[in-house]
Amino acid sequence: MTKKNLAVCSFCGRSEKDVEKLIAGPSVYICDYCIKLCSGILDKTPAPATQEIATSSTSSPTSLRVLTPKEIKRHIDSYVIGQERAKKTISVAVYNHYKRIRALMQDKQVSYGKSNVLLLGPTGSGKTLIAKTLAKILDVPFTIADATTLTEAGYVGEDVENIVLRLLQAADYDVARAERGIIYIDEIDKIGRTTANVSITRDVSGEGVQQALLKIIEGTVANIPPKGGRKHPNQEYIRVNTENILFIVGGAFVNLDKIIAKRLGRTTIGFSEETDLAVTNRDHLLAKVETEDLITFGMIPEFIGRFNCIVNCEELTLDELVEILTEPANAIVKQYTELFEEENVKLIFEKEALYAIAQKAKQAKTGARALGMILENLLRDLMFEIPSDPTVEAIRIEEDTITQNKPPVIIQKSPEAIA
């Protein structure tokens, strides 16, 4: 085995030649040195796996503060541009979900239904960001999973229950907190079909994953292996009740608009052309989605039936992409401006340049995700040179910098300022 191919400890980086033992796990390794180190830490503090195994929250009813839908949306607005309908819908769903938990903790006679959410929309439209922002607002454990990595029992891949393990880890193994957490599952549409073409024929293993997810989404007491991986006899488990975990799933559902149009008796001629009219028509159709459309797409009825909130995230407009660049609390332009300010250099973006960046992102068809890549490629060389050049006072990004690959305008300091 060459040095390049030597297995190394995932924690300390020692290779298998530098340690006595190297234990392999799912895509990770741990050496005997790190095991001894962890053992010493665990001897001083109770190990999560040996703590009392709880299956329900023991917090008092007053410990759970429930924000109003308007408060939730106002916080989301600070980070997510556009998607007004989606933000309102999800704010109400989250509000009702946590009212439900509080009612259960207070032993009220009337119980509320669970408000799991299905987000439809193209890549980069803000589905994942909405879920991440919710987790920050509500101060609850949050984890993201990719549906394409999940497999049903008996297949090689990640068990569905490992999603709950990741939520438990995000809660520092506090079972009560994990049972009030949020799980976001992305690419959910990819487990409903076998090809990129719309078909009513479902992939057998994909349907199996939907069945496995259905169990934890509708609520069950899951036996979670503390270390992950496949279950085996004589293994210790942590019991987690998933009944009050909020599940949000998202997917692009490509060509779902054609299924809806067929049901409504409309034509989709010209939808392959990415014109503003075509995008608007597609968004209007997705806003009319019904359960039967998702079933035709390839999702099983029982799975879709667990999501009483189905909402469409519309494709971002040019103006919204520009707003994303500059307006949110963590806007990308603000981040880069701050980085250059630390070098005492002012970074200036002309308005036309911002629109050119937004247009370039729109052409990439990955929504807001393309914005960061465009700016990184644009500013990488400058970030390399500027720390070693005390003569630069400001950098101006013009439209030609984006559209014609012209260098940014470098404004030098006056000789007096340098001296």
Curated annotation (Swiss-Prot):
Zn(2+) binds at C9, C12, C31, C34. Gene3D superfamilies: 1.10.8.60, ClpX chaperone, C4-type zinc finger domain, P-loop containing nucleotide triphosphate hydrolases. ATP binds at P122, T123, G124, S125, G126, K127, T128, L129. It holds the Pfam family AAA_2. Keywords: ATP-binding, Chaperone, Metal-binding, Nucleotide-binding, Zinc. GO terms for molecular function: ATP binding; ATP hydrolysis activity; ATP-dependent protein folding chaperone; protein dimerization activity; unfolded protein binding; zinc ion binding. HAMAP family: ClpX. Belongs to the ClpX chaperone family. Component of the ClpX-ClpP complex. Forms a hexameric ring that, in the presence of ATP, binds to fourteen ClpP subunits assembled into a disk-like structure with a central cavity, resembling the structure of eukaryotic proteasomes. This is ATP-dependent Clp protease ATP-binding subunit ClpX. It comes from Chlamydia trachomatis serovar L2 (strain ATCC VR-902B / DSM 19102 / 434/Bu).
